Amino acid sequence: MTKANMQRQDTRYVALLLALAILMLLVPRVSAAEYTASGATKFVFTDRVITVTEGNYTGYKIEGTELTINGAGTYIVSGSCSDGSIKVKKGTTGVTLVLNGLTLTSAATAPIACNKSTEVNLVAASGTSNTLTDSAKNNDDNYPDNADAENAVLKCKDGSQVTISGSGTLKIIANGKNGIKSGATTDEEGTASLTIRNVNLTIHAPVNDAINAEQTLNIESGTTPISAADDAIHSDYVLNIG
């Protein structure tokens, strides 16, 4: 890529960010109840294990530093882990996943993956800072032997309906490919959508897109500083802002 092309891309991103900033100022911030902590099941990540405080919701499985959610409920995650992941099992609905001061890195896959036909509200809890990071290996173009590659830090697969909300902060660092990847609507998996609402979301994507959505992308409110090597925001179908 020539220096002139890089300058044109930088200008494009700056213009996009300015436009988004103006739109966000015009949209009133929503004051919504983020989640109900009472009865929630709580997890704390470390580099070696995940510890759990039982609540009312038992739809989960732990293997080492891998957490799988397979039942509806409110699940609160915190702590720090240099190689771990959270997955919401295919077809699981009614999930509220609360990031309550979580720093989660994955060495080969997506730190958080919402599998096909899931319904997930991902909440950055008030007063907390949360960071999700992947590695260069989370890219099956460059690492075709990595069967676990999801090509995004936050992967939302076909038919998934995911909302990112909360008054805390969420930082996404995409060393593999995309920051957030949202899948498609299909007859088999159902309707897909990604909604960003009332959250302080920062995305650094030095390899590809910051946000890549194959279906409906709703950016309703909040602040979203973005840097990306390719598209800051890419939507194949419908992009709604405000």
List PLM regions with ranges.
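A composition-driven surface/loop motif
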Residues: Y13-L16, P28-G242
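Generic N-terminal leader/processing signal
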Residues: M1-K3, N198
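Generic low-polarity alpha-helical segments
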Residues: M1, I22-L23, A32
